[in-house]
């Protein structure tokens, strides 16, 4: 309940899904790097055969315009420009017959390329 208005407070759903598999893999990679200050930054940039492509990197800094999500002790960072393209997306880690990789399932993508790392909206 909101103490000011006595109305129920509804929690907003998380803007992204950061799966347990992805968080566990990031945690493992951070431990291998030996730097507990690292966070996973997921971003969108121009390029690829469909117009935009996903990127992943480690970062120690949280920028003012970053959205931060915590999962299993791991921080996921998404900058404000990338946020608009990733709202509702699932960030996962798959290790199967096709190889091991981070995968983004993005409901905003209207087309994707065969490799899955490039998309258009």
UniProtKB/Swiss-Prot annotation:
Keyword Repeat included in the entry's annotation: no
Domain of life: Bacteria
Cofactor(s) required for function per UniProt: iron-sulfur cluster
A GO BP entry: iron-sulfur cluster assembly
Disulfide bonds: none
Alphabetically ordered keywords of this record: Iron, Iron-sulfur, Metal-binding
Binding site for iron-sulfur cluster: 49, 113, 115
Molecular functions (GO terms): 2 iron, 2 sulfur cluster binding; 4 iron, 4 sulfur cluster binding; iron ion binding
Cofactor note: Binds 1 iron-sulfur cluster per subunit.
Gene3D superfamilies according to UniProt: HesB-like domain (2.60.300.12)
Recorded family membership: Belongs to the HesB/IscA family.
Quaternary structure annotation from Swiss-Prot or TrEMBL: Homodimer.
Role played: Required for insertion of 4Fe-4S clusters.
Protein's name according to its UniProt entry: Putative iron-sulfur cluster insertion protein ErpA 1
């Amino acid at each position: 309940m909101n103490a000011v208005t006595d109305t129920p407070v509804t929690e907003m759903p998380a803007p992204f899904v950061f799966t347990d598999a992805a968080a566990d893999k990031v945690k493992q990679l951070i431990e291998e790097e030996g730097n507990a200050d690292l966070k996973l930054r997921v971003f969108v940039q121009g390029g690829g055969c469909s117009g935009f492509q996903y990127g992943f990197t480690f970062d120690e800094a949280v920028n003012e315009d970053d959205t931060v999500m915590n999962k299993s002790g791991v921080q996921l960072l998404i900058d404000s420009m990338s946020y608009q393209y990733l709202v509702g997306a699932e960030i996962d880690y798959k290790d199967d017959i096709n190889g091991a990789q981070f995968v983004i399932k993005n409901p905003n993508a209207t087309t994707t390329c065969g490799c899955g790392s490039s998309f258009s909206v």
